Amino acid sequence: MGLLSYILLGFTHPSELRAMIGYKVWRDPLNDIKANPQASGWDRQRMRDCWGFLDLTSRSFAAVIKELKGELSRVICLFYLVLRALDTVEDDMTIPAQRKIPLLVNFYKYLEQPGWNFTESGPNEKDRQLLVEFDKVIAEYQLLDVGYKTVISDITAKMGAGMASYIELSAKGPLKVAMWKHFDLYCHFVAGLVGEGLSRLFSESKLERPWLGHQLELSNHMGLFLQKTNIIRDYAEDCEEGRYFWPQQCWGDDFAKFESQPDVAKGIIEIKPGHFRPADNELGQRSMYVLSSMLLDAMSHATHALDYLALLKEQSVFNFCAIPQVMAIATLELMFNNPDVFKKNVKIRKGVAVGLILRAVNPRDVAYTFLHYSRKMHARLSPADPNFTRWSVELARIEQWCETYYPSFIAAASEGKPTDIRANALRSWSESRRTQALILKQAKLNGSDASTLDAKSVLEAAQNSALDPRDLMTEDERAAQDKRDRDQMVKFFLIILVGMVTFMGIVALITWEIVWWWTMDTPDPLSVYVKHAYYLVKTQGWSTVKEVLRTTRLSFEHVWKHGLTSPPKLEL
């Protein structure tokens, strides 16, 4: 982004510009691979080359992988490079099927062959160099512990076999998927297995609980949520290259009735360069129905992803898993009822992505990010959509999940906004528990019976003896005190600002007079104006001046008493 783009972003989306500045200036990475070269392998040129391959293949994934704790960052880096090399072989259309299938099936065996590489990739393959220098990845792989090697080899074998089966099917014609269950199986091979492998590596590293590696179903949902989002987003590119991943059961059902996946885009028309909308006829409705069905299928994995994230305990692992998930839910919301999906690649803005990264730090914030985007989709959901009921149920599941694990009334109570009767009940209960704890503490100090102590006297005694009065305040009292402190601080800085401006004005005026008197022979215009104003006031009276001064004084008094905050609006 150029300077002009940032300036425009500041006017159109100031919160995103603020997030980008905050990320660049104030956010520090959780871990740095250069700070622990033995664990990350940065002390070896060969491993530094592998980190370079990771940067070339995916900068977004590279950033979160590098922040993983200890040796796990190196392990995940090699795991990603192995699977990326496998995926490069699968996607290379210049390799004939009879050569590609044995390569995919036996790829896991090559990890045990030092010096093996592959130089037959097409010249236009983005990650061709990774396969050319794959011997470096193999050498680093051999340095891993046996547990890590077992997981990586096992996942590579399963994924290679799954990819080979689809290559064999597509050898007779363009690759396409018939039914929803086949679509799930394909996504499992290319992404669900990645989630399974990551969970097993997390457990193997001892950073996460041992049983996390056995959560295969939740791990699969994590991978499918990301993969299905990417498949929907890449519709136009895949159709152009002859890859059809959307299941025929979706675009060829009794309502859609399309003959092929590329035909789905026929219901979308261009209104101006780069902007599209569905046609005002049945064809346009059927196209948007297919998009709605695909998005709904992807959304079915959302709450399962939240279940998985709630199991994680290591912060760097949580960030690694959560950031792609919040990106996915934001992308799904952007594609919801968006006909541009059929004609071009739809991506969230960079500022939005940075804001999501800053918020994806704990399960509650991630859950409420999901809730935020689900509500945005629900606001645009049309009853005319044949999937309206199913969409309502799926979005309500996210609402229910958040309310079950992170109830809104607890958030309301902590923020001092009693919008829910449960918040008042929670506040009263918390205050009674605090008072009871103080009574028990005072009784223990005095050696007296707690039942004989008066709550009011105990609170007064505690307030008098407390080192910090805030420790004995309720949430509401602490919030009110914070507001008073902020107002006092604003008043203080206002006085300082006025004083500085006044002083600088006086210095500027004196300098002006001296320079004019020293360099000019005529009277300075400022003195002439002041004299003119003085005689004007003298002749016309002081009533106007007094009224202006009175209004100014009342304004300053209002700011001094009430601060700079405006009174709340009356809501009916």
Curated annotation (Swiss-Prot):
Gene3D superfamilies in UniProt: Farnesyl Diphosphate Synthase (1.10.600.10)
Pathway given in the UniProt record: Terpene metabolism; lanosterol biosynthesis; lanosterol from farnesyl diphosphate: step 1/3
Segments traversing the membrane: 316-336, 492-512
Keyword terms, alphabetized: Endoplasmic reticulum, Isoprene biosynthesis, Lipid biosynthesis, Lipid metabolism, Magnesium, Membrane, Multifunctional enzyme, NADP, Steroid biosynthesis, Steroid metabolism, Sterol biosynthesis, Sterol metabolism, Transferase, Transmembrane, Transmembrane helix
InterPro entries: Isoprenoid_synthase_dom_sf, Squ/phyt_synthse, Squal_synth-like, Squalene/phytoene_synthase_CS, Trans_IPPS_euk-type, Trans_IPPS_HH
Subcellular location: Endoplasmic reticulum membrane
Keyword Transmembrane helix found: yes
A Gene Ontology cellular-component term: endoplasmic reticulum membrane
Matching PROSITE patterns: SQUALEN_PHYTOEN_SYN_1, SQUALEN_PHYTOEN_SYN_2
Bilayer disposition of the protein: Multi-pass membrane protein
Cofactor(s) for this UniProt protein: Mg(2+)
GO molecular function, one term: squalene synthase [NAD(P)H] activity
Enzyme kind, highest EC tier: transferase
Enzyme Commission number, as recorded: 2.5.1.21
Catalytic activities: 2 (2E,6E)-farnesyl diphosphate + NADPH + H(+) = squalene + 2 diphosphate + NADP(+); 2 (2E,6E)-farnesyl diphosphate + NADH + H(+) = squalene + 2 diphosphate + NAD(+)
GO BP annotation list: ergosterol biosynthetic process; farnesyl diphosphate metabolic process; isoprenoid biosynthetic process
Function: Catalyzes the condensation of 2 two farnesyl pyrophosphate moieties to form squalene. It is the first committed enzyme of the sterol biosynthesis pathway. Required for the biosynthesis of ergosterol.
Cross-referenced NCBIfam families: squal_synth
UniProt similarity note: Belongs to the phytoene/squalene synthase family.
UniProt xrefs under PANTHER family: FARNESYL-DIPHOSPHATE FARNESYLTRANSFERASE (PTHR11626), SQUALENE SYNTHASE (PTHR11626:SF2)
Quaternary data: Monomer.
Designated name of the protein: Squalene synthase
